[in-house]
């Protein structure tokens, strides 16, 4: 079980070509390329989402993790969120996906974030759906910032929509100062490949919007 703050920058990329150009321009070392499957949970009326929470079960290379994220605080272009997460067995993940258990069961009930989410959801959560994300992680040296891990994502959303983006997580300590220098460095890197620095919204929100478009 881990608990921490996540401070990250997200910028949209127009297409796969831009993603490849960004990786080349960063001139770093590709650390990994993994496929993630993300399952989102909420109450039927999306009460968690309405109160700023995101509840996710993720499978990556056979490893399963439940993550609860709290409401977002903006730090410039960066998003600052508290989160708590727990690794679980494939068997427990299967029970959650079958509706026989809730992801909230595996989280630390003594953590304030979990208590708030449980009170909000009344423990009645269902699986809303899932989406796939390919993540390429590149370690690079960003001018004016220093060592950084860039996460270059390709996300498959409902309706055949495919989004691309780059993420950079900033250490929570001294987040305001670090986020500002990271934002400048990442904007400069995008400028070098001729891509405008357009902040991206969270994947869960884009997934739900794409899901609603299908239903509508």
List the model feature ranges, each with a label:
Residues 1-216:
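Phosphate-end processing signature that detects enzymes handling 5′-triphosphorylated RNA
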């Amino acid at each position: 079980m881990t608990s921490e703050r996540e401070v990250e920058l997200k910028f949209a990329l127009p297409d796969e070509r831009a993603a490849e150009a960004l990786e080349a321009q960063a001139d770093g070392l590709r650390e990994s390329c993994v496929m993630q499957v993300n399952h989102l949970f909420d109450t039927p009326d999306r009460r968690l989402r309405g109160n700023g929470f995101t509840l996710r079960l993720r499978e990556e290379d056979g490893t399963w993790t439940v993550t609860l994220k709290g409401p977002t605080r903006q730090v410039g272009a960066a998003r600052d969120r508290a989160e708590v997460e727990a690794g679980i067995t494939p068997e427990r993940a299967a029970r959650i996906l079958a509706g026989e258990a809730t992801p909230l069961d595996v989280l630390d009930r003594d953590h304030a974030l979990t208590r708030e989410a449980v009170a909000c959801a009344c423990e009645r959560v269902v699986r809303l759906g899932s989406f796939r994300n390919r993540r390429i992680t590149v370690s690079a040296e960003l001018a004016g910032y220093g060592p950084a891990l860039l996460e270059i994502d390709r996300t498959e959303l409902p309706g055949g929509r495919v989004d691309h983006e780059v993420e950079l997580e900033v250490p929570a300590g001294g987040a305001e100062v670090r986020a500002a220098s990271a934002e400048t460095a990442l904007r400069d890197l995008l400028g070098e490949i001729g891509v405008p620095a357009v902040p991206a919204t969270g994947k869960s929100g884009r997934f739900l919007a794409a899901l609603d478009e299908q239903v509508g």
